[in-house]
Amino acid sequence: IDSAAQNSHKFRPFLKWMRNVIDKQFDQLIPLLKEHDILVSTNSEFAVASIAEYCKKPLIRTAYAPFLPGKKIPPAVLPFPKPNPIITPAILWKLMNRMTNFMVKDTINKNRAKYGLAPIRNFGYHAGERSYNYLLFSQHLGNVDPDWTFEWSIGGYCFNDTFQYDEKAYEE
């Protein structure tokens, strides 16, 4: 995966951009967080768990979908949302974690070393374990993975948590 992505003319600029964003998050957010009591971010801000850890501040990560690794619910960004006996949610989470680790882990660990923090082994688990995960989706659209060991709550959909829908059709 690494060599294919590094040699891809289409993927290389994205990878470079993402790693640059992570470096800038460390550079810019640490001084800001030192002046505040808590860090609130989306789940796509890759450096924030390490930044909050370094600054010894609590972190609330928000997500508009179930975005914590588990065995029952697949990642919201990957295909196969219906049960599949071969490509299970656990396999999809492992695949997503491998892709995410490839894209962000080395850059995060480079910055963690710069700030005297131990390296992380797995970005997905590190971020989930080091934050309070606040899920912004309607409780009426389903529950969460019973295997989640991370601290979380469902806050409801930020635009309209009371809309009507066909529950039978949704379950299919």
Model-derived features: positions:
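Alpha-helix initiation/capping motif
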Residues: 1, 84-88, 138, 166-167
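Short, charged, surface-exposed secondary-structure boundary motifs
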Residues: 1, 69-76, 163-166
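Conserved nucleotide-sugar donor-binding subdomain of glycosyltransferases
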Residues: 2-49, 87-123, 128-129
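Short, mixed-charge, low-aromatic patches
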Residues: 4-8, 61-70, 155-159
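Conserved nucleotide-sugar donor-interacting segment of glycosyltransferase catalytic cores
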Residues: 21-88, 140-142
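A nucleotide-sugar donor-handling region in carbohydrate enzymes
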Residues: 96-172
